[in-house]
Amino acid sequence: MKHSNRLTRREEYSRVLASGGTYIGQLAVMKAVPNSLELSRVGFIVSKKVGGAVERNRAKRILRESLRTTGLKQGWDIVFIARAKAATVKCAEMERVVKHLLGKAQILSKANEKTSSKAD
């Protein structure tokens, strides 16, 4: 994931968490808010409830990979908060959950909306 597509500063995370819409899934919670940029930026929060450092990093890698294969509409700041089971699932399961959350928020790009509706 490119540096320009990531949320990096505390203020960016705080803005999304405070004013973003909340979408709840089995493996993750997503908060999203429109931004005024030509691109979408994504951040990840994985607490110690998920497990030790190895499990937390695995959960982030799975979330990142799920987003890499999923197209997003431009102009959104998105934060994914991993739930405790996130480190134990296969990438395909996480991808299904991520597509479902993005579809609920209407952030999924047009090309991926059709494949998301078939998965649910």
UniProtKB/Swiss-Prot annotation:
Keyword annotations from UniProtKB, A to Z: Endonuclease, Hydrolase, Nuclease, RNA-binding, tRNA processing
Q: From the UniProt record, give one GO term of the biological process aspect.
A: tRNA 5'-leader removal
User: A cellular component term (GO) from this record?
Assistant: ribonuclease P complex
* Example GO molecular function: tRNA binding
Q: What's its catalytic activity?
A: Endonucleolytic cleavage of RNA, removing 5'-extranucleotides from tRNA precursor
Per the UniProt record, which EC number(s) apply here?
3.1.26.5
Instruction: Enumerate the transmembrane spans.
Output: none
Source domain of life is Bacteria
PROSITE patterns documented for this protein: RIBONUCLEASE_P (PS00648)
Q: What InterPro entries does its record include?
A: Ribosomal_Su5_D2-typ_SF, Ribsml_uS5_D2-typ_fold_subgr, RNase_P, RNase_P_CS
Please state what class of enzyme this protein is.
Answer: hydrolase
**Role description:** RNaseP catalyzes the removal of the 5'-leader sequence from pre-tRNA to produce the mature 5'-terminus. It can also cleave other RNA substrates such as 4.5S RNA. The protein component plays an auxiliary but essential role in vivo by binding to the 5'-leader sequence and broadening the substrate specificity of the ribozyme.
Family classification: Belongs to the RnpA family.
Q: What is known about its subunit structure?
A: Consists of a catalytic RNA component (M1 or rnpB) and a protein subunit.
Protein name according to UniProt: Ribonuclease P protein component
